[in-house]
Amino acid sequence: MTRSYLPLNSLRAFEAAARHLSFTHAAIELNVTHSAISQHVKTLEQHLNCQLFVRVSRGLMLTTEGENLLPVLNDSFDRIAGMLDRFANHRAQEKLKIGVVGTFATGVLFSQLEDFRRGYPHIDLQLSTHNNRVDPAAEGLDYTIRYGGGAWHGTEAEFLCHAPLAPLCTPDIAASLHSPADILRFTLLRSYRRDEWTAWMQAAGEHPPSPTHRVMVFDSSVTMLEAAQAGVGIAIAPVDMFTHLLASERIVQPFATQIELGSYWLTRLQSRAETPAMREFSRWLVEKMKK
């Protein structure tokens, strides 16, 4: 038999049906109908001029010819699949450099990285964290994930998620807070953005802290929450990025009032042309954030 006459679809149908001893299970595996499997097997039997299955009370049984053919097909299809996997795994690696603000990295991205690497093994993802003040051109970054209003000079920005801010503190401190005004009895922990506590206190219907109030300033919300867990003071932070701490009850949100001064964005310089790897990462991350 010459290669030009190999009935490949019929051979696939027979191999699946023979492994399962079931036309129904073969149809499910190959995503075709039961009748399609039956017709392919019939075509192969006519082509070979022999019977490959016999029906018995329990279902199907292979004939001697079927038993001889099955291991040959198993081996052939396994070798083909193995070679295709080798091609896929040796696809040229595409480097992708991402700078991500630390809070988003720990709150969202790190837990999803294994999923990305399984789905895109050809992309060499190189991550660096920053405190939201970053120079993408100087650092050679393809994308940066930043917190803010979405408008940075010379930059395209794609929305990822909202970032509501609220006070977070230890359960012991929270137990002593009877109204938002009581927060001012403690050291206030904040980022380098000066307006966070003022905006939150006003949203809660209270006077803002005085210019001389005890304040500790952090360049990382992750570090700030470490201080809050140690009882140093009360932090104002993006609550959705610290759900793991809230779930553990090491940190609590003492009041429901939240404010929003910015969101998280996936950004790239307008001068940076998108590569296939960049587009794949962007689609993957945006879809993840919709779930």
UniProtKB/Swiss-Prot annotation:
Keywords: Activator, Cytoplasm, DNA-binding, Transcription, Transcription regulation. InterPro entries: LysR_subst-bd, Tscrpt_reg_HTH_LysR, WH-like_DNA-bd_sf, WH_DNA-bd_sf. Pfam families: HTH_1 (PF00126), LysR_substrate (PF03466). Gene3D superfamilies: Periplasmic binding protein-like II, Winged helix-like DNA-binding domain superfamily/Winged helix DNA-binding domain. Residues 23-42 bind DNA. Coiled coil: none annotated. GO terms for biological process: DNA-templated transcription. Residues 6-63 form the HTH lysR-type domain. It is found in: Cytoplasm. GO terms for cellular component: cytoplasm. It comes from the Bacteria. One of its GO terms (molecular function) is DNA-binding transcription factor activity. This protein is a positive regulator of gene expression of cephalosporinase (AmpC). PANTHER family: HTH-TYPE TRANSCRIPTIONAL ACTIVATOR AMPR (PTHR30537:SF70), HTH-TYPE TRANSCRIPTIONAL REGULATOR (PTHR30537). Belongs to the LysR transcriptional regulatory family. This is HTH-type transcriptional activator AmpR.
